Amino acid sequence: MEGQLLRGLAAQQDCSIREKIDLEIRMREGIWKLLSLSTKKDQVLHAVKNLMVCSARIQAYTAELQKSKEEIANQTGARLVLDSSSENKEGESCRGKIALSDIRIPLMWKDSDHFSNKECTQRFAIFCLFRMGAQVFDTDMVIVDQTVTDICFENVTIFNEAGPDFQIKIEVYSCSAEESSLTNTPRKLAKKLKTSISKATGRKISAALQEESPEACLLAGSVAGAKYHLLAHTTLTLENAGDCFKTHNLSVHGDEECSFWLPLYGNVCCRLVAQPACMAADAFAGFLNEQQTGKGLVGWRRLYCALRGGKLRCFYGPEEIEAKVEPALVVPIDKETRIQAVEKDSKKMHCFSVLSTAAGRAVSHIFAADSLADFQEWMGAFRQHFFDLSQWKHCCEELMRIEIMSPRKPPLFLAKEATSVYYDMSIDSPVKLESVTDIIQKKIGETNRQFLIGRDDQSAAPPWAAVFDGNHEMVIEKKVLSPIGEPAPDGKRKKRRAPLPPTDQPPFCIKTQGRANQSKDSATQAGVSGASSSPSDPRLSPPTHHLQKPVAAPRKLLPARKNSSADIGHTDTKTSLDAKPVPVPRQKSIRDILDPRSWLQAQV
């Protein structure tokens, strides 16, 4: 039964690996199709790089699958499998995370190459490949020329489930990024071969192109002009891990005669961080009773203890860990710590002592478990923790932080050149300044210098334009204002009463008759209109004073208007009338004066 369970777990692991292999195969087929349609140098370089990464992952998964099959085949019985697995489990250390970041590869150019010919420098495409067991990762591709002194990769690569015996192989690949070497993609190369050789061979190549896998026509990774070559490599282990930048040696391949060669300094600088699980999480946690002695008395206090990172932290409850409360007691657990069982106490049976060194002196603590099972679990956790500390070595002295960098902007040499951006811009201006000037000059010539921007060409000229247009006869007419056309006074303004008639003069009376009064009334109206239009005429002012209709004057004088000469004249007339007021009889209204019956009474 146990053997079947183990076989089932192995089968699930094999199924997971096969799914990964199928995924990489589908991705590789898609990359081949994109590569056959790529025409730009950046597209070809990225496609070939991704193709190499997929092939490397397929090889790693295949090797892992073959290794698991061999392990299952070597096991002959279920009992043997169980025994060996339990033995291996006791001898295995905890897993951990490995982070590789901030890779710098210095270059060593000649002075003549670095400081001269900056406009015509050779460019190279560089990327790194990291391998650890079945895990394969890559970095971004960067473009390097003779003006660059360091190859920089800003990626943060994290390997999960790594053991203390890990080995990370760093491979640096290079490819020439010249235009002339990147023009031939697989399909284009095959078409050229088809047209340059015999028809029979051309048909074979055409049939090969119709197949799903382009590898039938051309070998993988050997695309003409876009092949990456191994430039340098190195292997990093636990000894190279640290919480700071370190320099490691590189094994360089090739020489100056190779097209992909770069003058490497022979070193790589990076930050390799190892974070064991026993440092990042609790190895074991549970309740323990600590013995306390004072003044000859022995007491026990119950604490919740957590074993992590070479320390036994004791709290009064598990909720204090979530609240990030300072522990009540911290006991160091390192390679110098000694743990042993003590004699059975009358009250506490499962006791053990922890002898550690603190501040240069030995300190002993006695703990008791609640049951035998808890006691055995704690003893096993201490043994495993000691084994993990011995395997991960200096990585367990202090927790190393893994910094996951936020996405940054691409380096300057990856950005598009300013000249190409300028040429790609499309300035579609509907009208240019020169064309506007030409249109204005043309309009001025057609309209005999009378063109006005924003007006209609056929619009009539203003009346005052004749004054400035040569010698012309002009007729100026006075504008006669009738009383009917005058605007009505504002009803909102306050009016004042007319002054009282003087007492030393007799009241005015009308001595005319019949139609003579009617003609006199018409003459009076004409005189009033003439006086309002031209007050300076002395012939019109006397009848105006004698026959003017009494109108109540306003209480407050209005300000004189300056808009027209007629208003100024009217104001002067009012001023003269106010200076010499003529009394008007208030006993009769205009209706009584115009009534014929009043004329008869006057004659009598």
Swiss-Prot record:
Keyword line: Coiled coil
Compositionally biased spans, kind Low complexity: 529-543
Residue span of region Disordered: 481-590
Pfam families: Anillin, PH
Listed SMART domains: Hr1 (SM00742), PH (SM00233)
Purpose of the protein: May play an important role in lymphopoiesis.
PANTHER family tied to this protein: ANILLIN/RHOTEKIN RTKN, RHOTEKIN-2
Protein name: Rhotekin-2
Gene (name only): Rtkn2
